[in-house]
């Protein structure tokens, strides 16, 4: 993989990570404002404070958490020099796929296989199913005008 592509992917990873963390901060600020508006003085408020990481994990969705982990893993792979190599077949992941999903671990073929094995595969039905010629309308389907 050339240095230019590697730097481009690294930048995309860092930008996506920043976006997710920004969404977290926005959520946190909103929760703080709402909490301050309805706050009653309590002695136990300071007890049991969470660490920043625990708060982060509590306030992010599961998808955002998984994406953050994948981004961090991809950044580690860049540092180790193993970024852009499919973890299943060992082939280089094509540039268009890396640009679209810079935290991907697999080439498209292997990703589909992994999804099938894990039960998360959703087939693409293609454009043809939306072709107006393929749509049949029965007379009873049409409401009276």
From Swiss-Prot:
The keyword Zinc applies. InterPro entries: DnaK_N, Znf_DskA_TraR, Znf_DskA_TraR_CS. One of its GO terms (molecular function) is zinc ion binding. Pfam families: zf-dskA_traR (PF01258). SUPFAM superfamilies: DnaK suppressor protein DksA, alpha-hairpin domain, Glucocorticoid receptor-like (DNA-binding domain). It comes from the Bacteria. A zinc finger (dksA C4-type) spans 86-110. Keywords: Metal-binding, Zinc, Zinc-finger. This is Uncharacterized protein aq_250. The lineage of its organism: Bacteria, Pseudomonadati, Aquificota, Aquificia, Aquificales.
């Amino acid at each position: 993989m050339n240095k230019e592509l590697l730097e481009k992917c690294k930048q995309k990873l860092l930008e996506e990570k920043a976006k997710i963390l920004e969404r977290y901060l926005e959520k946190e600020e909103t929760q703080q404002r709402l909490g301050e508006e309805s706050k009653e003085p309590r002695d136990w408020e300071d007890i049991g404070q969470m660490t920043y990481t625990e708060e982060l994990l509590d306030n992010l969705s599961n998808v955002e958490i998984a994406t953050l982990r994948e981004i961090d893993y991809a950044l580690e792979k860049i540092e180790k020099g193993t970024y852009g190599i499919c973890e299943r077949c060992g082939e280089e992941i094509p540039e268009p796929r890396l640009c679209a999903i810079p935290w991907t671990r697999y080439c498209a073929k292997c990703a589909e296989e992994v999804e099938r094995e894990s039960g998360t595969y959703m087939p693409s039905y293609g454009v043809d199913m939306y072709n107006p010629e393929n749509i049949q309308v029965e007379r009873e389907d049409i409401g009276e005008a």
